[in-house]
């Protein structure tokens, strides 16, 4: 209790915590030694102060230790396509559809997500609307990844340590450090990420945290239109993280021969509408939703290092859709998720 008070005092005085201090603070929270009032203070305090890469790193380390593991054979080759959410863009489920395209291109995808908080259709809502069963035990998720190339981990089942913070977070009702660490606590131990963030200021923070956490390769992106994805509307700010280091650049759709289109063409109002758009993309229909998926899938394939450059990755993404392989992955995933 005294440790919690001391570290909350530092946050209240706008002092940054070290990774170790944040790890220790989150340990107190996760193991039930912090009160609801203290958790609420942590939520509001970190929100007002602003989270540092070291604080994100420390929190992620703790919750990674507490996660229920998915027993995959080779976690270092898996990719997660995930966003922080909170961009209020109401786009269809681009990251999940991108996951099917990656799997169709031979990349094993371990998708980590939840039901909707801020969007019209969370990844779990979308998969359920497709007919998939999402609340699966770790061994079953591992089997799906191995046999189909795509598996989904429904976050609440894999993060029992997060239960302590649910009520205080809901009562305070602001975006906080807990929203930031979720995407980085993949239960399959993923080392490769295409990670979208809701604000440009967080791109480099996440990149530094990922580097310190030892990822093999990641792209952290924030797209024009304020979205946590590679944007078809305009430029996307990208930071690449690899074992060699960190570099940032701006990407434009024109680099892959894609014309800019309005994000209004990829917005939906429900999971069912998202399913309709997703199936049109995977069945080969031309248009803005397809372009949006191809841009994101290009970066996802590049993360897997199955392509030498973005143009090769783009061609692989097109082949995954146009050959019907991506749609086949979706159909097999839905079928097997209900059988196992």
UniProtKB/Swiss-Prot annotation:
The reply on keyword Amino-acid biosynthesis is yes
One GO cellular component, as annotated: cytosol
Q: In which pathway does it act?
A: Amino-acid biosynthesis; L-tryptophan biosynthesis; L-tryptophan from chorismate: step 2/5
What biological-process terms (Gene Ontology) are attached? Answer: L-tryptophan biosynthetic process
Binding, anthranilate 2: 169
Cofactor dependence is on: Mg(2+)
A Gene Ontology molecular function term for this protein is:
magnesium ion binding
Keywords attached to this Swiss-Prot or TrEMBL record, sorted alphabetically, are: Amino-acid biosynthesis, Aromatic amino acid biosynthesis, Glycosyltransferase, Magnesium, Metal-binding, Transferase, Tryptophan biosynthesis
Q: Which amino acids does the record list as binding Mg(2+) 1?
A: 95, 229
Q: Which reaction does it catalyse?
A: N-(5-phospho-beta-D-ribosyl)anthranilate + diphosphate = 5-phospho-alpha-D-ribose 1-diphosphate + anthranilate
Q: How is the cofactor bound?
A: Binds 2 magnesium ions per monomer.
UniProt-annotated binding residues for anthranilate 1: 83, 114
Q: Could you say which EC number(s) this protein's record lists?
A: 2.4.2.18
Which EC class is the enzyme in?
transferase
**Residue numbers binding 5-phospho-alpha-D-ribose 1-diphosphate:** 83, 86-87, 91, 93-96, 111-119, 123
Give residues annotated as binding Mg(2+) 2: 228-229
Q: How does it assemble?
A: Homodimer.
Q: What does this protein do?
A: Catalyzes the transfer of the phosphoribosyl group of 5-phosphorylribose-1-pyrophosphate (PRPP) to anthranilate to yield N-(5'-phosphoribosyl)-anthranilate (PRA).
The record's family statement is: Belongs to the anthranilate phosphoribosyltransferase family.
Q: Please identify the protein, giving its name as recorded.
A: Anthranilate phosphoribosyltransferase
């Amino acid at each position: 209790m005294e440790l919690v008070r001391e570290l909350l005092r530092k946050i209240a005085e706008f002092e940054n915590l070290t990774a170790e201090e944040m790890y220790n603070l989150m340990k107190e929270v996760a193991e039930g030694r912090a009160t609801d009032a203290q958790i609420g203070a942590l939520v509001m305090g970190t929100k007002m102060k602003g989270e540092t890469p070291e604080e994100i790193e420390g929190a992620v380390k703790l919750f990674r230790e507490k996660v229920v593991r998915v027993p995959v054979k080779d976690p270092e080759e898996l990719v997660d396509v995930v966003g922080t959410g909170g961009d209020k863009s109401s786009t269809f489920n681009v990251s999940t559809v991108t996951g099917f395209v990656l799997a169709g291109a031979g990349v094993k995808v371990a998708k980590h997500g939840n039901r909707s908080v801020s969007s019209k259709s969370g990844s779990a809502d979308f998969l359920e609307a497709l007919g998939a069963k999402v609340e699966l035990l770790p061994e079953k998720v591992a089997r799906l990844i191995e046999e189909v190339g795509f598996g989904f981990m429904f976050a609440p089942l894999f993060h029992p340590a997060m239960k302590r913070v649910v009520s205080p977070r809901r009562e305070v009702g602001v975006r906080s450090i807990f929203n930031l660490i979720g995407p980085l606590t993949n239960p399959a131990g993923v080392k490769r990420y295409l990670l979208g963030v809701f604000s440009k200021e967080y791109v480099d923070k996440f990149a530094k945290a990922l580097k310190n956490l030892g990822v093999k390769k990641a792209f952290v992106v924030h797209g024009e239109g304020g979205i946590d994805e590679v944007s078809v509307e305009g430029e996307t700010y990208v930071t690449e993280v690899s074992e060699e280091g960190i570099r940032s650049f701006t990407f434009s759709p024109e680099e892959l021969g894609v014309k800019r289109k309005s994000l209004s063409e990829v917005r939906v109002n429900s999971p069912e509408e998202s399913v309709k758009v997703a199936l049109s993309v995977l069945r080969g229909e031309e248009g803005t939703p397809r372009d949006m998926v191809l841009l994101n899938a290009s970066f996802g394939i590049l993360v897997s290092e199955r392509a030498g450059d973005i143009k090769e990755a783009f061609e692989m993404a097109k082949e995954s859709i146009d050959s019907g392989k991506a749609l086949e992955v979706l159909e097999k995933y839905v079928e097997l998720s209900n059988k196992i």
